[in-house]
């Protein structure tokens, strides 16, 4: 769909306006493109033989803030946790949301190109989401908590999933000096944009990651446990709690799983003696 000299600064406003007013003649090619992207997302999540895939370094994982976790991804971990059905559904919904939002961007008059374009740096491949109005864009579905980091610009100081390094890879490959996140709040339906104006050096990052992956032993743990004040025990922080390799990674101290308000809390087993009188569940 040909853009009408739109700028990405008005993208969210224009999508909202489209949803308010609708359009009598949606572009049929764009509709088919959205449908094809959704079908591919469903096929990939439901029928791709993930257990048979050989793990490889990609743009989407070299930005992981924990190279130790990535080492286990590449070199194997017999105790690694498989993705739960809920997690797979969450990933699928993220792909479907991406296809829908990019369609809405087109219908709102913005130029959307290079969807799922493959790029490569130093042998590491990746597929970017899109380029909108000439700007590199990565669509993210997020929680209300995560949304705040995009809205107030604090993502650079709190990026547990390596979004900026991933964006930097795409930007470096395309010769861009910035990249824009188009974030969607899964709870409220709100959209916002955040532009990262400083991209990291992907080639340097790739070199360091490749060196780490070739080691016989995994790199040191980059994250320390945090103190749970109410239990007076040490527990895993956010990054480690969500990691599929936490059992192996913390085997030297062991983990003590408890639940608080229905949510798992991973205490260090060796810290149990610090508070023997605490209740086992919260």
Residue spans of the language-model regions?
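Metal-dependent nuclease catalytic cores that hydrolyze phosphodiester bonds in DNA/RNA
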Residues: 1-136, 143-157
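Metal-dependent nuclease catalytic regions and adjoining charged, substrate-binding loops involved
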Residues: 5, 23-29, 157, 169, ...
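Short, conserved glycine- and acidic-residue-centered signature motifs
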Residues: 159, 163
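A structural signal for short, well-ordered beta-strand segments and their strand-loop junctions
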Residues: 131, 136-139, 178-183
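Short, basic, helix/turn surface patches
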Residues: 136-143, 207-213
